Structure formats: structure tokens, C-alpha cells
A protein has these predicted regions:
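Active-site acidic/histidine clusters and adjacent loop/turn architecture
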Residues: 18-69
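Loop/turn elements at helix/coil->beta-strand transitions in domains of secreted/extracellular proteins
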Residues: 10, 62-66, 120-123
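Acidic helix-start/capping segments at beta-turn-to-alpha-helix junctions
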Residues: 65-79
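Catalytic cores and adjacent binding grooves of peptidoglycan-active enzymes
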Residues: 4, 84-149
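C-terminal segment of N-terminal export signals and the immediately downstream linker at the start
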Residues: 1-14
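Cysteine-centered nucleophilic/redox motifs
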Residues: 52-57, 74-77, 102
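Short acidic/His/Gly/Ser-rich catalytic and metal-binding motifs that mark active-site loops
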Residues: 23-25, 77-80
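Short, solvent-exposed loop/turn and secondary-structure capping segments
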Residues: 14-15, 80-82, 114
Length: 149
């Protein structure tokens, strides 16, 4: 897995799964990269979303890092953004550690969206005006958003 946090400038390249097990140190590092960048609050990310990112990377046939716009979002941050009318869901999967908003330098957001839809691993939100795709490990569904980052 290769991740770059667009807000903090931090990046990580790691193997988080080997020999049928998650690698604790790698998962800890992923949780750090995907933390709420406003509060530095960390929540363990759901294994389903980590696996979804891995499958998405494989489907896109790329080793380029995912550029993370948003991973975990604390309830406090989510509420503030919701009240500001930024366009976040009141009960966002980001709060549960089950969602990541991302893009990639090596693939278009349309390619990412199409690959994510093909996986049928959860929700896929396409935000062309903001330049990212939302993926989560919740129920399979799709939407087009209009949020500007």
C-alpha cells in the first residue's frame, strides 16, 4: 500500500498483509496517515476499507500512491464541516473509519471511479469538481457529488 496525505505532506509505502495476517505495525502506520488531519485524532480504520484500497490498487494496475484527501474524520470535525455546509454526510462513513477520499497522479478520477464501481465493495462517490473519488466499505451504492475542495 502506498499513501500520500495531501494535507500533511506525509507519505507511506508499506505491506499491511502477509502470510494470511494483517501486519500490526503497518496497520498502525496506515491509521496515522489516514488520521483526522484537523485534530490529529486517530481511529483504527476498518479492515474492509484497507482491503478495498488494496484491491483498487490492483485493479488499477498501479504502484503510484493514492493521494488521500480524507480518511478518518472525527465526529467533531464532521459536525463542524456539516454545519458549515461543506457537503459532508451527517453520519459519514469517515467517522467510522470506513471511508477514504482519494485521487492518484497516475490514474484519472474517472478510471478510479470505474475501477471502484467494478469491485462492488461498497460506496463510490465521484466528485469531478473537487477532483477525488470517495470509496467506503459500506453498502454497495454510487453517487455523483458536487463538493469543491
Amino acid at each position: 500500500m502506498s499513501l500520500y496525505n495531501t494535507h500533511t505532506g506525509e507519505w507511506l509505502r508499506t505491506v499491511y498483509w502477509a502470510d494470511g495476517h494483517y501486519i500490526r505495525e503497518a496497520v498502525r502506520d496506515i491509521n496515522w496517515i489516514l488520521r483526522d488531519h484537523d485534530s490529529d485524532e486517530i481511529r483504527p480504520m476498518n479492515a474492509g476499507v484497507l482491503d478495498l484500497l488494496g484491491m483498487l490498487r490492483d485493479r488499477l494496475d498501479t504502484r503510484d500512491p493514492f493521494l488521500v484527501v480524507c480518511g478518518y474524520r472525527s465526529p467533531t470535525t464532521n459536525r463542524r464541516l456539516y454545519l458549515e455546509g461543506v457537503g459532508v454526510a451527517k453520519h459519514s462513513y469517515h467517522i467510522k473509519g470506513m471511508a477514504v477520499d482519494l485521487r492518484s497522479e497516475g490514474r484519472s478520477i474517472e478510471q478510479i471511479r470505474d475501477a471502484a464501481l467494478g469491485l462492488r465493495g461498497g460506496g463510490v462517490g465521484y466528485y469531478p469538481h473537487s477532483g477525488f473519488v470517495h470509496v467506503d466499505c459500506g453498502p454497495v451504492r454510487q453517487w455523483r457529488g458536487s463538493v469543491r475542495a
